Amino acid sequence: PGLGSGWGALSEYAVVCDPKAPWPGGAPDCAFAQTVLDDDLDPVDATMIVTFREVLSNIRYFGIQPQDSVVVFGCGPVGLTYLKFMSLLGVKDLVACDILPEKLEQARNYGATHLINSKECDVRAEVRKLFPGGVDYVLDAAGSPAIVNQGMGLIKDRGSVLCYGVPEKEEVTIDFSPADYNWRVIYQQMPRKREEGEAHAQVVEWMRSGELNIKDFISDYFTFDQAVEAYQKLLDRKILKKGIITF
């Protein structure tokens, strides 16, 4: 009682569960995402595997296929991971949108086939030039409710706007006047832990094959004494990729 083990959250202690143990009524959901790391994996950098597993399990849940076209809003570490993983899974039509030129240039190295600066141009016009009938998916990797409405004018009939993570507000007003007749909005605030655990093997396989370099997604390291500085840097948007606090 009073103890949890869903995530770290700077905890000093954690409860680790074994899903294969004979739990009365079955193992708790969190147990399926608690995976023992192989000895050759750096436990500091391996914190990035949490994002990797969440993203891969979300791609599977969303149902994105190699033949699909996807517009990704937000080229931070999460958006870059989506681009990289969809590229590894064979998706050829990947459009990256961001307001920062330096992040867009990064996106090209992670699988993006088209770059759009959403601050400098009309995103809908640019996307429709590339895909006159619209795209299959618009993915919000930035956590902005405005992207839901922006995406309505980008997707094809029966296309989907996909939202990953916790939105700024717990309500969204959807203006679907720019959309075709049929559309979907899917929110995935957190993947189920069993699905996250099932993604672990593929992530590690990509790492071992050299197709996925974990350090490509980390830009900053901080000691625990620098934790306040780290969070301030995050709030000031000065961490380009992932920042890790070491203990």
Predicted regions and their residues:
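NAD(P)H dinucleotide-binding glycine-rich loop of Rossmann-like/cofactor-binding domains
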Residues: 1-69, 73
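Glycine-rich helix-loop-beta junction characteristic of Rossmann-like nucleotide cofactor-binding loops
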Residues: 60-65, 130-132, 153
